[in-house]
UniProtKB/Swiss-Prot annotation:
SUPFAM superfamilies registered for this protein in UniProt: 1-deoxy-D-xylulose-5-phosphate reductoisomerase, C-terminal domain, Glyceraldehyde-3-phosphate dehydrogenase-like, C-terminal domain, NAD(P)-binding Rossmann-fold domains
Annotated EC: 1.1.1.267
The protein's name in its UniProt record: 1-deoxy-D-xylulose 5-phosphate reductoisomerase
A single MF term (Gene Ontology): 1-deoxy-D-xylulose-5-phosphate reductoisomerase activity
Biological function: Catalyzes the NADPH-dependent rearrangement and reduction of 1-deoxy-D-xylulose-5-phosphate (DXP) to 2-C-methyl-D-erythritol 4-phosphate (MEP).
GO biological process: isopentenyl diphosphate biosynthetic process, methylerythritol 4-phosphate pathway involved in terpenoid biosynthetic process
Species this chain originates from: Vesicomyosocius okutanii subsp. Calyptogena okutanii (strain HA)
Binding-site list for 1-deoxy-D-xylulose 5-phosphate: 122, 148-149, 172, 195, 208, 213-214, 217
Length: 383
C-alpha cells in the first residue's frame, strides 16, 4: 500500500488521479489532499477518502473546511504547509498537480525528501530546471512526468539515448488551430477554454490555446531528458492520438499512442515500472480516423516562438517569460486584455527585464516577483 499526497486535488489532474485510485483501493491510500480555495469540493473528498491531512492554501477556505469536517482530519493552511506535508515520513508518492509557479516549492521539497514525484507542474522545471534535476539526483528521488507528451518520451527512451537524433512533442493546436489570426482579437475567455480534446483548468486551457503550454513543455523536456533546444521539435497533431515520438539516427522512430485521457499517464506514474488498469479503453486503430500532422505556425502562435527563444537565451529568460504569461492570462480571463495581448505582454516583459544568470532558488523567486511587477505595469498601458 502506497500513501499518496495529492497536491491540487480539485483540479483536472487531481480528479483523474482519484479516479485511478478508486480502481485500486488495495494498492493506494490518500494520505493528504490539497486545494487552493475550493473548500466545498474538499469536504466531499475528505468525507470519501478520509485523508490524514487536508491543506487549503487560502486561510479563509481552510477555516471553512475545518468547521465543516466532523472527523479527526487535520486541516492545515498556507504554502508552507504543502512543503511540510510532502516531506512527511508517511508520504510515499507526491502528485504535484498545482498549476503555476506556486507549485514549485512543494515539488522541490518532495524531491529533497527523496519521494516519488509524479510531476504535473511544468513550472517547477521552467523556473528551476537545473536546481530541480540536481536535487532529484542528489536525494535519490524518483521523477515521473505526468504529462501525456513527456510520459510518451519517457516510455520511448527506455531503450536508452544512444543514437538519439531528436524528440518530437505533439500538440493538438488547441481550439483555434484553423481560426484566422484576424479573428484572434475577439476571442473570449470561454472560447479559449473550450479545448477540443482535453478537459483542463482555465489557466492551462488558455495556455493550450496560445500554445504557451507547448512552449513550457519544450522547456520541461530540455531539463527532463537533458536535450539541446535543437533536439526538441513540435508538430501539430489535432487528434491527440500520437502523444510524442523519438527519432534515432538509424532512421527509426518510436512513438507512444493512446486515447487522449490523462488517467493513462497517471496510472503509469503510480505503477511504474509496472503497469496497471487506468480505466481507459485501449486504442482501436481500425476505427481511428486519419491522423493529421502539421508544422506549427510561429507567427500565429507567437507564444510558442517566445518559449523557444527563451530556452535558447537561457538564464532568467524562462522565469521571466513564465511570470509574464501567468499575469497576462489572469488579466485575459478577467476580460481586462485581449487574447492577442498575451504574447505582446510577455515579449515586452522579456525586453524590459535585465537578462542575467540565476544561481540559487532565492534568485529564481526574486526574479519571478520582479517579472510579475513589470508585467503588471506593462498591462496598465493596455487599459
Amino acid at each position: 500500500m502506497k500513501n499518496i499526497t495529492l497536491l491540487g486535488a480539485t483540479g483536472s489532474i487531481g480528479k483523474s488521479t482519484l479516479s485511478v485510485v478508486d480502481l485500486h483501493p488495495d494498492k493506494f491510500n490518500i494520505f493528504a489532499l490539497s486545494a487552493n480555495t475550493n473548500w466545498k469540493q474538499m469536504i466531499k473528498l475528505c468525507n470519501k477518502y478520509q485523508p490524514s491531512y487536508a491543506i487549503m492554501v487560502d486561510e479563509q477556505s481552510a477555516e471553512k473546511l475545518s468547521n465543516a469536517i466532523t472527523t479527526d482530519i487535520q486541516v492545515l493552511s498556507s504554502v508552507q504547509a504543502l512543503d511540510k506535508i510532502v516531506t512527511h515520513q508517511d508520504t510515499d508518492y507526491v502528485m504535484a498537480a498545482i498549476v503555476g509557479a506556486i507549485g514549485m516549492s512543494s515539488a522541490l521539497c518532495g524531491a529533497k525528501a527523496g519521494k516519488r514525484i509524479m510531476l504535473a507542474n511544468k513550472e517547477s522545471l521552467v523556473l528551476a530546471g537545473d536546481i530541480f534535476m540536481k536535487t532529484v539526483k542528489e536525494f535519490n528521488a524518483e521523477l515521473i512526468p505526468v504529462d501525456s507528451e513527456h510520459s510518451a518520451i519517457f516510455q520511448c527512451l527506455k531503450s536508452g539515448k544512444s543514437g538519439l537524433n531528436k524528440i518530437q512533442l505533439t500538440a493538438s493546436g488547441g481550439p483555434f488551430l484553423h481560426t484566422p489570426i484576424s479573428q484572434f482579437k475577439s476571442i473570449t475567455p470561454d472560447e479559449a477554454c473550450a479545448h477540443p480534446n482535453w478537459s483542463m483548468g482555465r489557466k492551462i486551457s488558455v495556455d493550450s490555446a496560445t500554445m504557451m503550454n507547448k512552449g513550457l513543455e519544450v522547456i520541461e523536456a530540455h531539463y527532463l531528458f537533458s536535450l539541446t533546444p535543437k533536439q526538441i521539435d513540435v508538430v501539430i497533431h489535432p487528434q491527440s492520438i500520437v502523444h510524442s515520438s523519438v527519432f534515432y539516427k538509424d532512421g527509426s522512430t518510436l512513438s507512444q499512442l493512446g486515447n487522449p485521457d490523462m488517467r493513462t499517464v497517471i496510472a503509469y506514474a503510480m505503477s511504474y515500472p509496472k503497469r496497471m488498469n487506468s480505466g481507459v479503453s485501449e486504442l482501436d486503430l481500425t476505427s481511428t480516423a486519419s491522423l493529421e500532422f502539421y508544422q506549427p505556425d510561429f507567427e500565429k502562435f507567437t507564444c510558442l516562438k517566445l518559449a523557444f527563444e527563451a530556452l535558447n537565451k537561457g538564464g532568467n529568460a524562462m522565469i521571466t517569460m513564465n511570470a509574464a504569461n501567468e499575469i497576462a492570462v489572469k488579466y485575459f480571463l478577467n476580460h481586462q486584455i485581449s487574447f492577442l495581448d498575451i504574447p505582446k505582454i510577455i515579449d515586452q516583459t522579456l525586453s524590459t527585464m535585465k537578462h542575467t544568470t540565476l544561481n540559487s532558488l532565492e534568485e529564481v523567486i526574486n526574479n519571478d516577483l520582479i517579472a510579475r511587477e513589470i508585467a503588471h505595469e506593462i498591462i496598465k498601458q493596455y487599459g
